[in-house]
Amino acid sequence: MTVRPTLRPKPGSIPTDPGVYRFRDEHGRVIYVGKAKNLRARLSSYFQDFSALHPRTQTMISTAADVDWTVVNTEVEALQLEYSWIKEYSPRFNVRYRDDKSYPYLAVTLNEEFPRVQVMRGARRRGVRYFGPYSYAWAIRDTVDLLLRVFPVRTCSAGVFKRARSSGRPCLLGYIDKCSAPCVGRIGVEEYRALAEDFCAFMAGETGRFLRQLEAEMKQAAAAQEYERAARIRDDIQALRTVMEKQAVVLGDSTDCDVIAIAEDQLEAAVQVFYVRGGRIRGERGWVVDKVEDVSTGKLVEQFLAQTYGGADDEESTTAIPREVLVSAEPADRDAVVAWLSKRRGAAVDVRVPQRGDKRALMETVLKNAEQTLARHKSQRASDLTTRSKALAEIAEALGLAEAPLRIECFDISTLQGEHTVASMVVFEDGLARKSEYRRFSIRGAEGADSDVAAMYEVISRRFTRYLEESQRVGELDTLGESGAPQGAERKAPRFAYPPNLVVVDGGRPQVAAAQRALDDLGIEDVAVCGLAKRLEEVWLPGEEDPIILPRTSEGLYLLQRVRDEAHRFAISYHRRKRAKALTASVLDDIPGLGPVRRAALLKHFGSVRRLAQATAAEIAEVPGIGERTAQTIYERLTSVEGGQRTQPENSKADE
């Protein structure tokens, strides 16, 4: 897969200023929006090493036909413009936070003459005050039922309110004093609005004021020997305390903050938020997002803050954005985010990572919830038997297979200009990753323009040659056993003895043709082959002129994407290690005055080249036999190695 020549901007045409850029497809539709402190540096990163890009970034670049940008003066302006464009275009490749479920809110319709309290879901409406979200709607109804004793605001629908107004008779709640019955004029407009605003104030955390007020009224009633009224007020106080007890106290009474934590893996991320008002947890919410590109946790935090707080209406920003936002990782452009949030709120907003105390403990709780949300989401999609069965059935139907492919093997090639070419093989059985079966290959003979295709032919040939050899060996062992061979010896199945039902290759028609040709040359006819191209996620079959397009919501497509992305991750991690090993080894070999004895001393002292590369010149000079001048030379040479290549070895099988 390559980048379209028309997509790559001319050298020097991209400015170095901050700005926002848009990728468009061949129909002119915006498919991705991003921002950058330096447009030239950011956009150039998309056109360097295509194979090293995140799988979904490769898909985006392959789909794009054009890119344009807008220069701005500050990073704050870039953040604002990025949010505006994402909201306007809804680009398919931008991160989109979606709920694991539709969370209910307690809503007060302050935009109405007589505000109503109700349960609301979905998009926010202008002029409505929201509290929550809550995990369950019944929790809201229980809370409202208790609060109506003290704040008898209406909960009826517009139709019921209109009928009561016409008939002059209130509903049942009006008769039992759980509604002030504005429909029949028992309370004036201004007095009723004050009552609704008191309800909102209590829900916002101003609990102490109302408790003190009611306690004073109860004492006055008792002193005046109005014992029935005092008893009613006592019950009102108990109702408020019951509501407060349901909301755990976690921080100081004056603390208003949102606590945001992100848990992530290679493909997805989960965000969990606890809403703290008046020191109490007033609500919580979780999102799950597909990672479109290889973004940092700080960038995910920044994108989440922009999408979450950017959606608040200007008139509601003061209440939607708290004074303090606690995050698990600092936003990528913290100063710009803080300035933008402060401008929207109309007052200072502090965005920080808590380091100690109660806030740090609460952050760890929120992070644990985020990890559980991600695990629950992945389990639901990947481990649920019904979902897995559906995915495998969809794949079988789309590819015309006689039965579901219970064992899928996916192969991916990773190379850089034909050097250090490697391949990966990942295995999914019954829709689940079987990591003990993963294999990796160092490609021996793939060079030149068609190295990717040649490498695919080689790895398929090697894998299935081993299959034929080992299956024959297993047959010979079975024959020996039947003829009286010694019993009791452990018989462990060879690593390549089991064939897959389906081979998936990362690529389009050329890669699929190479894989099929390798199988044909070996005389293997009972293994199906398909390829998943990054462009538009097309599924290619051998000998077909046109690809198969699975629906984007298809569980079968989701499983194929997971298999392909896992193969890509496994291949590229091995490729980086191999390339880094070769590069660092050659650097040590080329350093003047550094012979075998000194190299051995360095490795013995630091344990590995990677740790040596992380050491300072002074630390290197502490090694016996290494002077300050040699240490400085070693330090300068090793620090020139690309940082992205210093990856930790992955726990996997040895090269095949």
Swiss-Prot record:
Keyword Membrane on entry: no
Q: Kindly indicate where the leader peptide sits in this chain.
A: none
Give the record's keywords alphabetically: Cytoplasm, DNA damage, DNA excision, DNA repair, Excision nuclease, SOS response
Q: Which SMART domains does the record associate with it?
A: GIYc, HhH1
User: What Pfam family does this protein match (any one)?
Assistant: UvrC_RNaseH_dom
Q: Which InterPro entries match?
A: GIY-YIG_endonuc (IPR000305), GIY-YIG_endonuc_sf (IPR035901), GIY-YIG_UvrC_Cho (IPR047296), Hlx-hairpin-Hlx_DNA-bd_motif (IPR003583), RuvA_2-like (IPR010994), UVR_dom (IPR001943), UVR_dom_sf (IPR036876), UvrABC_protein_C (IPR050066)
**Family, per the entry?**
Belongs to the UvrC family.
Q: Does the keyword DNA damage apply?
A: yes
SS bond partners: none
Domain UVR residue range list: 208-243
- Function, in words: The UvrABC repair system catalyzes the recognition and processing of DNA lesions. UvrC both incises the 5' and 3' sides of the lesion. The N-terminal half is responsible for the 3' incision and the C-terminal half is responsible for the 5' incision.
Share what the entry says about its subunit structure, partners included. Interacts with UvrB in an incision complex.
PROSITE patterns according to UniProt = GIY_YIG, UVR, UVRC
Subcellular location(s) of the protein: Cytoplasm
A GO biological process held by the record: SOS response
| Record-level Gene Ontology MF annotations | DNA binding; excinuclease ABC activity
NCBIfam families attached to this UniProt entry: PRK00558.1-5, uvrC
Query: What region holds the GIY-YIG domain?
Result: 16-95
- What is the protein name stated in its UniProt record? UvrABC system protein C
Q: Which GO terms describe its cellular component?
A: cytoplasm; excinuclease repair complex
